[in-house]
């Protein structure tokens, strides 16, 4: 009451009223600003003001039991006065120091596990190399980049379920962990975070960083993988760049990189097969990248690259609506067109049928090393503003834009015939014919395009037909800009269709992608790519084909064995034997095949002459179209390691070595697997079937000299006798028949007599 009375007295004096109304603080807006709401309006000032007080901190009453009233220097750590408006204690900043030095300690074992991404970032920075700083104009373009190194690729929903299961396992709510990656991560995190004392909310937040890809649309000049983006603020400014080599790689970047390589290899291989789409799907489904199924990665990974998008389209996934031409991503930003077939004549008077886009359109063109804005009308380039890292990159963009414009002077600039073909030896479509032609040599195109004088516009210069810059003249309609063109930022995905030749179209029928757009660049994948499909065996060379073929036979031996005896033709036509044919000398393929098929037929005709190892060894040779000949072979040649190597019909060789004791097969010294059944099950083995034209007289007779091998028998005259080594090392006496007889009767009697002779 005293206070109020005092205030009333003050207010009655005119001077007080004048001070309060005339000075600026009475602005109601200002008073409101600083007094309304719980949000601190000037945190820095508030902090300074608070810290100037003796006890700026409030704490729970329990602190009085945990901290002494005074420290060793005798300074007071907390005040006995209660905090106004609450039952908390006023505490000095010195109490924090005391607590840090003398307070209870807790286990730090979980910190690196929870704050894994931070710890890993520090390691990468420690081992990274920072190079010199260069001052130069930076052409940055906004790209969608991954800002979060070291993450898995779960969707937000999948990650949410994993986090709930790990951090709040007892909370109610339906959680369905279906994908393999979800289950693996959940199991691993539960084990690692047992008895973790860190606040659950913090754990949840850190887990999210580890599980979900976070992307931002940022201006970048240079590397776009996440280990570069995390140091973007250190490596590029407006007018400077600092060289940097990351001190470590992260799995998400490695997956992105390996996925692109796998997709390119698969699309290239599918293009040359009889049914590209079916082959592509078969390969995507049977390939693993770093131990994860490629189809799972494709479903989760947002990487946009031509080959990757073709694979996604084949799987029925949505992809970006932009289209690709000449290695540039085109996005229409305004205008529209209708398509019409038109016949045009090249400078060489060759007729081309092109699909002309009629109408005014504007596009952004984004490539790895150059970007541009293109404005065009029907078969006319109106304006192209291009920016790039160097002369070469700018020239590439200009060629693509000139071809895309479909201008007559471009078509008339063609010298010579257009007959480019793709990997499957099919002619390319006319637009890609033109593109390839000018990518090889664009001199005539640039000379014929025409030049024009230019106005002085800030940030733009001209470019001459020889690709040198100029401030006076430029190629008609074309300017070079210092500023880059941003990548298309939208993450919108559209439904597309794909035909059997892997051409991807949007719902209006526009071609977005085709195999011609897939880069030929070869790279080495960071993660192991395992192609289980036989179509990809060739990728690692002849040795890989050889080993993979035999591994496949051994893995599938149960079914192969049945087919071998019941339906050999179907077996010989299996695509798994296709790659092997490239190893067999062309001239010998048909003869080898005929010989092996005859041999197999003899085995089938004669019971008990089944030799597993020999069938496995010779089977791939039977896949070629057979030639009927009476040729006999003791060995078959395959071209590996740069020369012909022999596979012996009987017995082991460096190429094909079967160890009876371990039952394991080695091909070129590499393990190709184990035979689960006993290969000796066929008693006498295949040899009896090869004894065509011989009579078996009985057991070995030393009078006739040492045992010959089956191949040496060929030299015997009719009626001559000899000892011969057959089967598993048994020796019998034979006589060459005086007349030719059927294979069948010979083989049947041979089998019976061998049994008698041995027993």
UniProtKB/Swiss-Prot annotation:
It comes from Influenza A virus (strain A/Seal/Massachusetts/1/1980 H7N7). Keywords: Cap snatching, Eukaryotic host gene expression shutoff by virus, Eukaryotic host transcription shutoff by virus, Host gene expression shutoff by virus, Host nucleus, Host-virus interaction, Inhibition of host RNA polymerase II by virus, mRNA capping, mRNA processing, Viral transcription, Virion. SC35 was derived from A/Seal/Massachussetts/1/80 (H7N7) by serial passages in chicken embryo cells, thereby acquiring a multibasic cleavage site in its hemagglutinin (HA) and becoming 100% lethal for chickens. SC35 was then passaged 11 times in mouse lung, yielding the mouse-adapted variant SC35M. The record marks 627 as: Avian adaptation. Plays an essential role in transcription initiation and cap-stealing mechanism, in which cellular capped pre-mRNAs are used to generate primers for viral transcription. Recognizes and binds the 7-methylguanosine-containing cap of the target pre-RNA which is subsequently cleaved after 10-13 nucleotides by the viral protein PA. Plays a role in the initiation of the viral genome replication and modulates the activity of the ribonucleoprotein (RNP) complex. Gene3D superfamilies: Polymerase Basic Protein 2, C-terminal domain. Its main location: virion. This is Polymerase basic protein 2. The gene is PB2. Belongs to the influenza viruses PB2 family. It comes from the Viruses. A motif (Nuclear localization signal) lies at residues 736-739. GO terms for biological process: 7-methylguanosine mRNA capping; cap snatching; DNA-templated transcription; symbiont-mediated suppression of host gene expression; symbiont-mediated suppression of host mRNA transcription via inhibition of RNA polymerase II activity; viral RNA genome replication.
